[in-house]
């Protein structure tokens, strides 16, 4: 007899019980645990819903990974499994063989079914399988701890599909007996009120990643604060609020909202990304004030910064330890940049990426920034592309990078002297100017990757990712 023969005999025994409809809860209590996965797969493929219900009641493993078996949601299958759970949670005394603690509806554990189907029977014994069946995603449970149902929730429509609707309705009427655990929740389309109702049915400690895209005014973002305050294990948060989906907040650690603030008060944020918010001048100061711990990255794009906004950037502790600062497509040609220089001084010891791109910074403003920029010794990337500066101002800028030995990528605009009256580059003029700029730079340090002028180069299509000391098209 081959080594796979016992597996085949178990499969045949299970098929016989199912096809002859001899299966009862008493029969299942007497069967070896190795039979269950094979029988469950058979009942699943044959749509034997009563058998599925009974097998859930007698399931001899800690976890039932239904999601990896049911690739496409099937309402009747889900109903049968949940009816089996109903019988379990309603019993005051648990059945003798009851071990089931988690129904997992995520597609995360195909190995369980392939092992027991015989595809990998030679490499995994029942004892080893028993060790694999742990409940890693939830706390250790005592005798009367709630059952847990795991699912990843991605809402791309305004309403739930029939399976999710049934599941959430089932959960609603079994509070305290069953916890719905969602480690990852994404909402792209569901209305705010409906989504908040769903959050009330999810076990809050289970949420580790939350992503919300909503069109609403910024002063309504605080409606999510009461829910976030309960998510003690939240590791990643991505929020996009506003009429153009422009305010992004990314967190890597727990966040504790200040319920008195219209903004979400994030205690351990990593990144704040603000884009195209027309009324940000009414909110930026408020937002920065309520960020309690230092940000790792601040990205501000396609908006207008007033002088007061600039002052805010230099005043609040939340921006005092930035590793990444990106100001992109922000018209600064009339803005006082002295506060930005103060901010650069504060973050000089931590800043690694500085992007001041397409901001129309002119010579007088650039010179205000140079002393602070020269102290940013950790800088590895500097993008100053898309600004309006002369050759002499760029030379001055390059000289001030003498101490920035870690710079690996630099992007600079074509000097004003090389542009025609339409703002287009005259390559015959730019070529010798760039050579002179490179001589100026090499007098103070040796560059690694550097670009002057349009990116990508309109002549050869080169990008600054190429490892060239100096890009020059003829």
From Swiss-Prot:
Q: Does the keyword Repeat apply?
A: yes
Name any GO cellular component annotation: Cul2-RING ubiquitin ligase complex
Q: In residue terms, where are the LRR repeats?
A: 97-124, 179-203, 204-230, 231-265, 266-291, 292-323, 324-342, 348-375, 376-400
Instruction: State the coiled-coil residue ranges.
Output: none
Biological process (GO) annotations held by this record are: negative regulation of apoptotic process; negative regulation of cell differentiation; negative regulation of DNA-templated transcription; positive regulation of cell population proliferation; proteasome-mediated ubiquitin-dependent protein catabolic process
Gene3D superfamilies recorded: Ribonuclease Inhibitor (3.80.10.10)
Which InterPro entries does its entry note?
LRR_dom_sf, PRAME, PRAME_domain
**What is the name of this protein?**
PRAME family member 10
Q: Which UniProt keywords apply?
A: Leucine-rich repeat, Repeat
The entry lists its GO molecular-function terms as: ubiquitin-like ligase-substrate adaptor activity
Q: Which family does it belong to?
A: Belongs to the PRAME family.
């Amino acid at each position: 007899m081959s080594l796979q023969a016992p597996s085949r005999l178990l499969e045949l025994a299970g098929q016989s019980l199912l096809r002859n409809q001899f299966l009862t809860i008493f029969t299942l209590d007497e069967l070896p645990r190795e039979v269950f996965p094979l029988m469950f797969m058979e009942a699943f493929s044959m749509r034997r819903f009563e058998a599925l219900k009974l097998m859930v009641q007698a399931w001899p493993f800690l976890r039932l990974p239904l999601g990896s078996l049911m690739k496409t949601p099937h309402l009747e299958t889900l109903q049968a499994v949940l009816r089996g759970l109903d019988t379990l949670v309603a019993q005051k005394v648990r059945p003798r063989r009851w071990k089931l603690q988690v129904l997992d509806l995520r597609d995360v554990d195909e190995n369980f079914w392939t092992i027991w189907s015989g595809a990998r029977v030679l490499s995994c014994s029942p004892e080893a399988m028993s060790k694999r069946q742990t409940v890693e995603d939830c706390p250790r449970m005592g005798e009367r701890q709630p059952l847990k149902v795991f699912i990843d929730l991605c809402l791309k429509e305004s309403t739930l599909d029939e399976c999710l609707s049934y599941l959430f309705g089932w959960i609603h009427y079994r509070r305290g007996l069953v916890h719905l655990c969602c480690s990852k929740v994404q909402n792209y389309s569901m209305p705010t009120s409906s989504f908040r109702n769903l959050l009330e049915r999810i076990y809050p400690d289970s949420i580790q990643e939350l992503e919300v895209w909503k069109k609403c005014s910024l002063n309504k973002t605080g409606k999510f604060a009461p829910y976030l305050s309960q998510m003690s294990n939240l590791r990643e948060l991505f929020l996009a609020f506003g009429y153009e989906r422009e305010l992004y907040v990314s967190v890597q650690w727990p966040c504790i909202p200040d319920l008195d603030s219209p903004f979400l008060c994030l205690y351990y944020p990593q990144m704040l990304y603000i884009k195209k918010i027309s009324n940000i001048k009414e909110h930026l100061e408020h937002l920065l004030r309520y960020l309690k711990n230092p940000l790792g990255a601040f990205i501000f794009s396609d908006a207008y910064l007033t002088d007061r906004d600039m002052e805010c950037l230099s005043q609040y502790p939340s921006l005092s330890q930035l590793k990444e600062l990106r100001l992109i497509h922000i018209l600064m040609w009339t803005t006082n940049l002295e506060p930005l220089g103060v901010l650069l001084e504060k973050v000089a010891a931590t800043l690694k990426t500085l992007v001041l791109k397409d901001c129309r910074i002119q010579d007088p403003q650039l010179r205000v920034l140079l002393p602070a920029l020269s102290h940013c010794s950790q800088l590895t990337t500097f993008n100053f592309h898309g600004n309006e500066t002369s050759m002499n101002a760029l030379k001055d800028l390059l000289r001030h990078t003498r101490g920035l030995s870690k710079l690996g990528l630099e992007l600079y605009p074509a000097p004003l002297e090389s542009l025609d009256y339409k703002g287009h580059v005259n390559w015959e003029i730019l070529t010798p100017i760039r050579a002179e700029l490179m001589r100026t730079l090499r007098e103070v340090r040796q560059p690694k990757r550097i670009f002057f002028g349009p990116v990508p180069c309109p002549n050869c299509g080169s990008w600054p990712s190429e490892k060239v000391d100096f890009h020059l098209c003829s």
